[in-house]
Each structure stands twice: as C-alpha cells, then as structure tokens.
C-alpha cells in the first residue's frame, strides 16, 4: 500500500468515511450472522478459537470473492464511467448467493445504507442506484454502495477494500461476543489478529477478475441455508 494512502482525501472526507464503516452505523448488520449461528447450533463453533476459524474461512471465501472483489470491480468500472457494468456486478453477486435469507439480508442492509448516506450526503450516483433498486432493475449490495460512496470521496481501491473489510470484521465479532458468548477482550484480540489476513486478501483481490465474482465455499452456504429453518435463533440470517 502507499505510504500515505489517504493523501488525496481531506480530513473531513476521511472522517465521513470512518462514520460509515463504524459498527454503530445503523444499517442492520447486527441482525445477521451469515450462517455463523448455525455453526453455534451444531456445536461446531463453541468458543473464541472456533469462531476465529469460522471467520477466517468466511473472509477467505465469501468476503474475498464477494464483497471484497466487487469493490475492486466497481472501482475498475467507475474509472471508465461504466455504470452499466456496476449494475451487472450487482446482479451477478446477488444471484450467486444461494441462501435466501442471506440474499434478503444483504439487500436490506444495502437499502438502509443507501437511505442513511443519501440523507447525510446526497451523492448523485447513489441516487441512480437507489432509483434502480426501487424500480427492480437491480437488487442492492452494501459493498457496491460503499464502493460508489468512497470512490466519490477519492479513496484508493485497496484502502476501500481494507476499510470495508474492517467494518465486516468488527460487526461479526460484536455479533459473536453476544451470541457465543465471547469476552470483549477476546473479541478485540480476534479483530487485531484478523488485520494480517485482511491486508493479504486486499492485495490478492487486486489480481482477480470478474470471473471469480460470487465464488463461495459450500460449507458456508449450506450453513446459511440450514439457518433458515433453525427454530431458536438471535439473527435473521
């Protein structure tokens, strides 16, 4: 990464980006475990070690080839002002998600993120995205919302992937803290240890093309599907 990756971003813009990636930004992510709760139900994840193994697998597959990669692809498309390609990636990533609740949860988070960002900042390209979602022409994905937002702010692609990844990790760990449960300190240790994986993945994503978009690990998808019929649960997905 650059020595100063935020050199072209004003302090005001940087703080506005930080606000969006903060785990307290109310977009509903805390309602979703994306299959982790099924691993709890089946006693596959029972403690901090088990959770960390699950998170590493999630980041290395569903995040890397999904939300992480789509941020890179959106940046590539926006460099040539190709919004039609962005809308195409929205459709590919959505239809590649096998679990119904995960698809629905992702769309709900995207809509809420769009609603909040537009109330705060009113960015034209996000107006276009919001309009297409309302018309049913695209589905909505929070990583695409974020990518369009930070591209508009002048943030670099690698930094965008890393910051979005941090937001995902932070939220998932907080969900694990209350669901497993984990201690707050154990949770923060997991967040810290995840940074090396996130940095490595950010670099690897730069070498991927659109043919990888939506690839996933069957075990994660099956857990997300089984969660849909789980009787007792804390999370919507």
UniProtKB/Swiss-Prot annotation:
Q: Which UniProt keywords apply?
A: Chaperone, Cytoplasm, Nickel insertion
Where is it chiefly localized? cytoplasm
| Annotated Gene3D superfamilies | Urease accessory protein UreF (1.10.4190.10)
Q: Does the keyword Ubl conjugation apply?
A: no
This protein's record includes keyword tRNA processing: no
The record's listing under InterPro entries reads:
UreF, UreF_sf
- A single Gene Ontology molecular function, please? nickel cation binding
Gene Ontology terms: cellular component:
cytoplasm
> Where does the UniProt annotation locate this protein?
Cytoplasm
Function per UniProt: Required for maturation of urease via the functional incorporation of the urease nickel metallocenter.
Assembly with partners or alone: UreD, UreF and UreG form a complex that acts as a GTP-hydrolysis-dependent molecular chaperone, activating the urease apoprotein by helping to assemble the nickel containing metallocenter of UreC. The UreE protein probably delivers the nickel.
Which family is it part of?
Belongs to the UreF family.
Name the record gives this protein: Urease accessory protein UreF
Q: Which gene encodes it?
A: ureF
């Amino acid at each position: 990464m650059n020595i100063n990756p935020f050199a072209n971003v004003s302090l005001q813009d940087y703080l506005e980006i930080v606000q969006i990636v903060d785990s307290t930004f109310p977009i509903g992510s805390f309602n979703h475990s994306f299959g982790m709760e099924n691993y709890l139900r089946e006693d596959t994840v029972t403690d901090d070690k088990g959770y960390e193994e699950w998170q590493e697998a999630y980041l290395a597959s569903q995040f890397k080839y999904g939300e992480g990669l789509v941020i890179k692809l959106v940046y590539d498309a926006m460099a040539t002002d190709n919004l039609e390609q962005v809308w195409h990636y929205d459709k590919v990533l959505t239809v590649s998600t096998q679990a119904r609740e995960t698809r629905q949860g992702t769309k709900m988070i995207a809509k809420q993120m769009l609603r909040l960002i537009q109330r705060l900042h009113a960015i034209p390209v996000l107006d276009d995205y919001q309009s297409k979602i309302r018309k049913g022409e695209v589905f909505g994905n929070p990583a695409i919302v974020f990518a369009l937002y930070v591209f508009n702010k002048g943030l670099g692609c690698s930094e965008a992937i890393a910051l979005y990844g941090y937001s995902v990790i932070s939220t998932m760990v907080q969900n694990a803290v209350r669901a497993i449960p984990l201690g707050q300190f154990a949770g923060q240790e997991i967040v810290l240890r995840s940074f090396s994986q996130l940095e490595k993945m950010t670099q690897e994503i730069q070498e991927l093309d659109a043919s990888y978009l939506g690839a996933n690990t069957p075990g994660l998808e099956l857990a997300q599907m089984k969660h849909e019929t789980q009787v007792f649960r804390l999370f919507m997905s």
